[in-house]
Curated annotation (Swiss-Prot):
Organism: Aquifex aeolicus (strain VF5)
Keyword ATP-binding annotated: yes
Family membership: Belongs to the RNA 3'-terminal cyclase family. Type 1 subfamily.
A single MF term (Gene Ontology): ATP binding
UniProt GO cellular component terms: cytoplasm
Listed name of the protein: RNA 3'-terminal phosphate cyclase
Major subcellular location class: cytoplasm
Superkingdom, taxonomy of origin: Bacteria
Example of a GO biological process term: RNA processing
Length: 360
C-alpha cells in the first residue's frame, strides 16, 4: 500500500462525501490517506471550505500532518495521530454547513478517551445539507448510547448567507485510550449501536420542528410552516404530530423545518426543508412532508440523509438497512469504506437493502 492509502476522489459521484468518509475512517483506523482528483467532475473542482474546516480541526484534534489543505486543491495527503480530549473551537467565517462537518467529527468524538467539547461557528440550516435539527433528532438517535454522555446544543442559528450559527458538541466517553485496532473498535460499539434495521413497525410518533428568524414572528412564519406540514400529514393519513415552533435571532433572515417519525421497531426517519424568499411558508412545510412520505412509502427503514451517515458505522459494527433508493452518493460511500476495509458490503438493489457483517 505504501505510506498512504490512495483514493481516487473522482470515483462514482465524485463529491465531497469521499473526503468526509475518508477523513473519518483514516483518523479512526490510523491509516494515512492520499486523496487525488478531488471533486474532479464538479464545475469547481477541488477542496471546498467545508472540507478544509474539517481538516483545520483534525490538525489539532488528531494532531494530523497534512499537505494540500488549500481551497481548490485537488490532492490531499492526511496522516492522523490519536484523538486528543479537550476543548476545540472552529469558526467557518461563512455559512458553511455545520451538519456536514459533524458527519465526520461527531462519530469521531465517540472514540476520544475522556471528554471533548467542540464549538463550531457556521451554518446550522443551509442549502445542500441536512438541518442541525435533523442531526439532533434523527442521527443522534442511532449513536447516543455509545458515549457515557453526549449533548448537541444549538446556541445560535446560522442561516445562509451570513452564517454565524453556533453549535456546541459535548461528549464524555468511558475510554482510557482510543481503540487500537479493528477488533477493539467493533467490541466497543457492539452492544451500543444496532444497525440491523430491515423491519418496520407502526408509526408511534411524528414530530414537527419549525424555526424562523425573530423578524418573521409578526408574519407567524414558524406557525405557518408547521401548519403546512400538519395539513400535508393529515391529507396523507399520518397521525397528528407533536409540534415545536421556535423564533431565533440570526445574522441572516431564514427559516427551516424538520420533520421526523418514530416507529414501534425503533426506526427514526426524517426530512427537512428551508424557506426562501417568495415561497409561501405553508409550502415549505408541505414540501418537507413530501420528502418524508417519499422515503417512508418506499418501504425504507432509513431516510435519504441517514443512509449516508450510517454506512461508515455499518462498516465497523455490521448492519442491514433498507434504503429509499440507491444513489450515486450511497454507492460511492460504500466504495470508500471498502477501500479501507476490503469487500464487506452486499447490495440487494431489488429489495433496496445494504448489508454487511462489518469488520472481521
Amino acid at each position: 500500500m505504501g505510506e498512504f492509502l490512495e483514493l481516487d476522489g473522482s470515483y462514482g459521484e465524485g463529491g465531497g462525501q469521499i473526503v468526509r468518509t475518508a477523513l473519518f475512517l483514516s483518523t479512526l483506523l490510523q491509516v494515512p490517506v492520499r486523496i487525488y482528483n478531488i471533486r474532479a467532475k464538479r464545475e469547481k473542482p477541488g477542496l471546498k471550505r467545508q472540507h478544509l474546516n474539517i481538516v483545520k480541526l483534525l490538525k489539532r484534534f488528531a494532531k494530523a500532518k497534512v499537505k494540500g489543505d488549500e481551497l481548490g486543491s485537488i490532492e490531499l495527503e492526511y496522516k492522523p495521530q490519536k484523538l486528543k480530549p479537550g476543548y476545540y473551537e472552529v469558526n467557518f467565517d461563512t455559512a458553511g454547513s455545520i451538519p456536514l462537518f459533524l458527519q465526520t467529527i461527531l462519530p469521531l468524538s465517540l472514540f476520544v478517551p475522556g471528554e471533548v467539547v467542540i464549538k463550531v461557528i457556521g451554518g446550522t440550516d443551509v442549502p445542500k445539507s441536512p438541518t442541525i435539527d435533523w442531526v439532533r433528532f434523527v442521527f443522534l438517535h442511532y449513536i447516543y448510547k455509545v458515549p457515557e454522555f453526549i449533548r448537541l446544543e444549538v446556541l445560535k442559528r446560522g442561516f445562509y448567507p451570513a452564517g454565524g450559527g453556533i453549535v456546541q458538541l459535548s461528549v464524555r466517553n468511558k475510554l482510557e485510550k482510543q481503540p487500537e485496532n479493528l477488533q477493539e473498535v467493533k467490541e466497543y460499539l457492539k452492544d451500543k449501536v444496532n444497525l440491523y434495521r430491515t423491519e418496520r413497525g407502526e408509526i408511534r410518533k411524528i414530530h414537527v420542528f419549525s424555526v424562523a428568524h425573530e423578524e418573521l414572528r409578526e408574519r407567524k412564519v414558524a406557525e405557518r410552516q408547521a401548519k403546512g406540514a400538519i395539513e400535508a400529514l393529515k391529507n396523507l393519513g399520518y397521525p397528528e404530530p407533536e409540534v415545536y415552533r421556535q423564533y431565533a435571532n440570526a445574522n441572516s433572515i431564514g427559516t427551516s423545518i424538520t420533520i421526523w417519525l418514530e416507529d414501534t421497531k425503533g426506526n427514526v426517519l426524517g426530512a427537512d426543508n428551508l424557506g426562501k424568499k417568495g415561497k409561501l411558508a405553508e409550502v415549505v412545510g408541505a414540501e418537507a412532508v413530501k420528502k418524508l412520505h417519499e422515503d417512508w412509502s418506499s418501504g425504507a427503514t432509513v431516510d435519504r440523509h441517514l443512509a449516508d451517515h450510517l454506512i461508515p458505522l455499518m462498516a465497523l459494527v455490521g448492519g442491514e438497512i433498507r434504503v429509499p433508493q440507491f444513489t450515486g452518493h450511497l454507492l460511492t460511500n460504500i466504495w470508500v469504506c471498502e477501500q479501507f476495509l476490503g469487500k464487506i458490503f452486499e447490495v440487494d438493489e431489488k429489495e433496496k437493502i445494504v448489508r454487511t457483517q462489518g469488520i472481521s
